[in-house]
Amino acid sequence: MTPADPVETATLAASVTPPLTKRGEAKAARRREMLDAAARQMAARGFAGVRLEDIGGAVGVSGPAMYRHFASKTDLLDQMLLDISRRLRDGGAEVVDRGLPPAETLEALIHFHIDVLVTKPDLIVVQDRDLHNLTPEANHEVRSLQRRYVEQWVDVLLALMTERGATLAQPEARVRVHAMFGLLNSSPRLPALDSARLRTVLTAMATAALECAAG
């Protein structure tokens, strides 16, 4: 039996995130509750129309207690939009890393984004509308995360067009991806539609926007 490499063992041990304690789990769950409540209220009333006290009241937390979790309303917004931006970037990377053919990868990216959109519409609304209310540092990081997410799509779209023998310049691929996000991300502000039908419609729209034949 080959003895374990101590360096490799130490590296693996360091890479494993220790499990949360029950107290840590409860704190993380409460934080998610607060962020979800904040997203709902900010999507409905705008960043300026919501106070930390309003958010706390929605989850049974007093105004002063909110400051144990967030330094300010802007700090809460920073964390909210950093969270969703990382989720999109990481989810897109996971799809790309599956190593599927370009057409299947693009389809999986579309389904992934629509799933986030349908299950977390308030976050998408706030992300789309309130970037200017972030601190400069958070704004810079969110935009960097968004650019990396966009480039994941651009790379897959270019690979698909190449596979099909079509010519598509990178700037146009980027325009198509941004336009597609504009279509999808506006849907939470449109009249309500059955979830299954909404997914079908958005998938068709996204595919058409990305693969359109522009002469």
Name the predicted role of every residue range.
Residues V118-E151, R189:
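Short secondary-structure transition hinges
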Residues R30, K73, M80, I84, ...:
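Hydrophobic/aromatic residues within well-ordered alpha-helical segments
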Residues E107-D128, V177:
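Helical hydrophobic small-molecule/effector-binding pocket
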Residues R86-R89, E137-E163, R174-H178, T200:
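Amphipathic alpha-helical packing segments from all-alpha helical-bundle domains
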Residues E33, A37-D75, Q79:
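Helix-turn-helix
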Residues M1-A29, R40, R164-T167, G215:
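N-terminal intrinsically disordered/low-complexity leader segments
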Residues M80-E107:
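Amphipathic alpha-helical linker/stalk segments
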Residues P3, D115-T119, D155, A159, ...:
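Amphipathic C-terminal alpha-helical segment
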